[in-house]
Curated annotation (Swiss-Prot):
Gene that this sequence comes from: nuoA
Enzymatic reactions: a quinone + NADH + 5 H(+)(in) = a quinol + NAD(+) + 4 H(+)(out)
Similarity comment text for this entry: Belongs to the complex I subunit 3 family.
Listed EC numbers: 7.1.1.-
Membrane topology value: Multi-pass membrane protein
GO MF annotation terms: NADH dehydrogenase (ubiquinone) activity; NADH:ubiquinone reductase (non-electrogenic) activity; quinone binding
UniProt keyword annotation of NAD present: yes
Compartments in which it is found: Cell inner membrane
Organism: Chlorobium phaeovibrioides (strain DSM 265 / 1930)
Pfam families: Oxidored_q4
Cellular component, GO annotation: NADH dehydrogenase complex; plasma membrane
Primary location: membrane
Name of this protein: NADH-quinone oxidoreductase subunit A
UniProt keyword list: Cell inner membrane, Cell membrane, Membrane, NAD, Quinone, Translocase, Transmembrane, Transmembrane helix, Transport
Length: 143
């Protein structure tokens, strides 16, 4: 029990020293830097150009979908890398497990592909127009 508390105590002291070091750096910088604000310094800097429009721009949802799919497959690599390093010791059961894992992710990719989430430009659905019916004869023309 004492050994565990001692290890957590070391981690806590290390964390506390890190916080003190960062806070000390901020306080030292605040005391030493000159403070001369003016409108040019407080304006928005955008690659040397004047800022145009609002910063609250709506991004296309396709960016998020592509990023999410990338993260999913990036995490897959993170999970498969340790498996690949000890593949020979694990045997055929581990191979089957890895293939099932990769298969599930490939099914997810196929689903996203079929659904159209990977298409950058989606075709707009078109509604067929109803053909115009010829004008019916009025009752006076029938007589």
């Amino acid at each position: 029990m004492d050994q565990t508390l001692s290890e957590f105590g070391n981690v806590f002291v290390f964390f506390l020293l890190g916080v003190v070091f960062v806070a000390g750096g901020y306080l030292t910088a605040r005391m030493l830097r000159p403070s001369r604000p003016n409108p040019v310094k407080t304006s928005t800097y955008e690659c040397g150009e004047e800022a145009v429009g609002s910063a609250w721009v709506k991004f296309n949802i396709r960016f998020y979908v592509v990023a999410l799919i990338f993260i999913i497959f990036d995490v897959e690599v993170v999970f498969l890398f340790p498996w690949a390093t000890v593949f020979r010791q694990l045997g055929s059961f581990a191979l089957v497990e890895a293939l099932v894992f990769a298969g599930i992710l490939i099914l997810g990719l196929v689903y996203a592909w079929v659904k159209g989430d990977l298409d950058w430009v989606r075709p707009t659905p078109s509604v067929p127009k109803m053909p115009e019916m010829p004008a019916s004869k009025s009752s006076s023309q029938r007589d």
